[in-house]
C-alpha cells in the first residue's frame, strides 16, 4: 500500500526523495517484490536530480556488478564523489576505501583519512574503525599514531562496531600500543562476543580458560 502510494505521488511530483525511496524499497523488497534492475532505474532517475543517497546506492550497484564496463565504473566513481561532497557519510566511507586501496585511482592515504574523518564525525562507525586501523598500522604517507588509533577505535567501539570492539579489547589486553587495562579489555571483548564476533568469543574463552588475567570461570 505504501509502495503504491509512493509511486502515485512520484508520478505527480517527480521528486528525487520519492524516487530514492521507491528504489530503496525495490532493492530491499520492502512493501513490494525485490527487483534490483528496477531499483537501479529509480536510483538512476534520482541520481540525475543529484540525490546523494541515490548516487551512493547506484555507484555501489555498479561497483558490485561484474558486468560493469570501465566507462560505467568511471561514472560510478564520479557519482560517489558527488555524493561524498554532498556529505553522504556512506559515500565518504566508500570513497575513502577506494583512495586507501588505490582502486581505479591513484592511492592517496591523506585523502582517505580526510574522507574517513568526515564520515566518522557523522557517527559512521566503519569509517572510525578504518581510521583506527590506519593510524595503528602507519604508512609512508601517514606516521603511526597509537594515541589517534586508540581514540578512533574507542569511538567506533562506543558506536557499537563489533570489529572495533574486538580490536580495542585486544589492544587494551596487550598493553603495547595503549595502556594495559584488562577490565576494559574484557568489557569490549564481551560486547563484541555478544554481537556474535567469533574472534572475540575465542579470545574471551582463552582468557577464562588460562585464567592468567581473570579468575578461572
What are the functions of these language-model segments?
Residues 5, 19-28, 57-65, 94-101, ...:
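Hydrophobic face of amphipathic alpha-helices that form TPR/SEL1-like repeat modules
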Residues 12-15, 28-30, 48-52, 64-66, ...:
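Short helix-capping/linker turns of helical repeat alpha-solenoids
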Residues 1-3, 208-217:
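Short, intrinsically disordered, charge-balanced linker/junction segments flanking boundaries
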Residues 1-5, 10-13, 17:
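N-terminal leader/linker segments that initiate helical-solenoid repeat arrays
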